[in-house]
Regions:
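Flavin (FAD/FMN) cofactor-binding and adjacent substrate-gating region
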Residues: 66-72, 92-167
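Helical element adjacent to the flavin cofactor pocket in flavoenzyme catalytic cores
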Residues: 125-128, 150-199, 203
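Extreme N-terminal leader/targeting segments of oxidoreductases
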Residues: 1-17, 35
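N-terminal Rossmann-fold NAD(P) dinucleotide-binding loop
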Residues: 26
Length: 264
């Protein structure tokens, strides 16, 4: 897949909205602003889609682990429903956009399983029932691992994010190899010029300017691994362990992708 290349910033510019970060969040933001006629600029310190986005297992789902019982306990039913609805709308928006591009978009069921903790699955299901989710409890799932059950979100999706970015980035106002070294209000200072903006959207993986929270002291490197197996079974869905140290599974074409082994 060939991702379009974009020039470096060369001199000062003015824009209504500055987006910092060229992963899927930043590029999608630029895409929507472009569609709506808003003057914008996106800057990326290296190449777009060269960080987290190009290494993801690329599941699009409103199911982010077993989070709904926690949100329900902390925020109540109304905000839990809002969170669910927002993510369902985002999924449908992806579906709408992907109709126009070849990016291997497929609707698939998503499962969060547990190897030993059935109680946490049942707790999550009770929360999902309270907020009227379409989730289902599954006693048995088709993965090469013994489980005690799974929470299923039907009709979620998977895709190829590199193919997706390659298509939606065409024609966007992007500057690559443009590193923001300092923010002065809403003005970004780079090695090749300043960007004067009315609004700034930070779409980087972590805070890049040390303002509040001293995040640079709290950050740590986390690594996980993925392998692609040939001649493996078709599991017809996307699966992830509720335990952070567990494994994820999904098919891509004739391959079976296995992820896991996360550690600091």
């Amino acid at each position: 897949v060939s991702i379009p290349q974009f020039p470096k910033l060369d001199g000062d510019i003015h824009t209504d909205v500055l987006i910092i970060g060229g992963g899927i969040t930043g590029v999608l933001t630029a895409y929507f602003l472009h569609q709506n006629g808003v003057k914008y600029a996106l800057v990326e310190k290296s190449r777009i889609c060269s960080g987290v986005t190009c290494k993801t297992t690329a599941k699009i789902t409103a199911q982010h682990g077993l989070v709904y019982h926690k949100i329900l306990a902390d925020r109540g039913a109304y905000l839990s429903q809002k969170y669910l609805k927002a993510n369902e709308l985002a999924l449908e928006k992806y579906c709408e956009i992907c109709k126009n591009f070849d990016c291997d978009f497929e609707r698939k069921d998503n499962y969060v399983y547990s190897v030993y903790n059935r109680r946490i699955l049942e707790k999550e299901m009770k929360a999902l029932e309270k907020i009227r989710s379409k989730a289902e409890f599954c006693e048995n799932i088709i993965i090469p691992k013994k489980t005690v059950g799974a929470v299923k979100f039907p009709n979620q999706a998977q895709f190829n994010p590199i193919k997706f970015i390659a298509k939606i980035s065409e024609g966007l106002n992007i500057f690559e190899e443009t590193f923001v070294s300092e923010m002065i209000g809403t003005t970004a200072v780079t090695q090749n010029g300043k960007i004067y903006a009315d609004k700034v959207i930070a779409a980087t993986h972590f805070p890049f300017i040390n303002k509040h929270g001293n995040y640079f002291l709290k950050l740590y490197q986390h690594r996980s691994y993925a392998v692609a197996l040939k001649n493996a079974q078709n599991i017809d869905g996307m699966y992830v362990d509720e335990n952070r140290k567990g494994m994820s599974f999904r098919n891509y074409g004739k391959l079976l992708l296995l992820g896991g082994g996360g550690h600091r």
